[in-house]
Amino acid sequence: MSRIIFLTTAASVLLAGAAPAAAPQFDTPAKVAYLYDLNSGAVLYAKNPDARMPPASMAKMMTTEVAFELIDKGQLSPQKMCTVRPETWQKWHAQGSTMFLSPGEQVSVDNLLKGIVTLSGNDASVVLAECIAGTEQAFTDQMNALAQRIGVRNSHFGTANGWPDNGVTYVTARDLATIARTTIEKHPKLYKQYYSLPNFTWGKTLGAGKDITQENRNPILGHVPGADGLKTGHTDEAGYGFTGSAEENGRRLIEVLAGMKSWNERVQESTRLIQWGFGAWQDKPLFGEGAKVGTAKVQLGSSSEVPLIAPRSLAVSVPAGLSSGNVQMKIHYDGPLVAPIAKGQEVAQLVVTTSDTPPQVVPLVAGDDVGRAGFFGRIWLGFKSLFGMA
């Protein structure tokens, strides 16, 4: 059963008392655009956010996310050596962006990840996929399974590198933002380690044998303050696309743009959109990290309820310069929750509504472990429920 709790704390009236302000306006020639505030959960701008489209190399974010997940679980070592199969080299050494791997070469997972993220290597993506799962097909099965687990609902991956495959691989802007958010939130150290390298050197030129250094194609890296990721994409079919992120004064935005006509348009629009997000909108704090937001009922647990905690500082996005405006908050969860529940487990959502934006949704986590009640405890809970004492 869906449970909704309306909040009447001081935070819920933090901005109360003034007439609504018009939401800031933005327009872009990009066919698809999406701007998401990670702190508030607000979608600041959306243009065709759920339209299916080919991702091109932006699919490599999901390839990287699979690797990050395995590394953080201790199931994959960055020092693991991978062999470049001659067949893989033959297919990918001159197909689009390349890391310039050599047939039979031994390459670490660490260097392959740098080749994927920084150089957009199609060859590196497939070599990593085969190294992890045995075949690219088996790896894409892992990509799709993980995508479902992290909330990617309208995308499918048929390749490890996003190369056109007659429509088997498709994504949406909203899903790409979900992948980016997951990487940033769940793997902050790996994100910082791999996604903001300005360049990477691998391979040798033919004849002279000189080192090959390629620049990171990220159009906002080094140009927008706080920019630190994520991934470009381009094919004739997809046009020019980009999923990017930047953090300014503790506030992080994620942007997705696709279907642009040129490299220059991608640079211009990705810079314009994220700068507009930082300039036209502001975050107003609601709850600090670790603050108790509310409680949720628990069924068959050692405790009848569990505190709901802010996993990070939570805020609401409002137009810049607005000192007040109507804000309503409610907690939503499917309940009662069923024990056992682990501390830190995401169990509810805080839904914040303002007069200027669509509902802003951020997660809430359990503040305590709640074990399953023992035999006699369950009998007592049943007794209380029977007589309306629960």
How should each PLM-predicted stretch be described?
Residues 1-5:
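Positively charged n-region of N-terminal signal peptides that target proteins for export
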Residues 6-16:
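Bacterial N-terminal signal peptides
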Residues 7-8, 27, 352:
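Intrinsically disordered/low-complexity terminal segments and short unstructured peptides
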Residues 11, 23, 45, 72-74, ...:
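Generic marker of residues within folded, mature protein domains
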Residues 20-188:
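Active-site-adjacent loops and short helices of periplasmic peptidoglycan-processing enzymes
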Residues 152-156, 167-390:
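Domain-terminus/edge residues, biased toward the C-terminal soluble/receptor-binding domains
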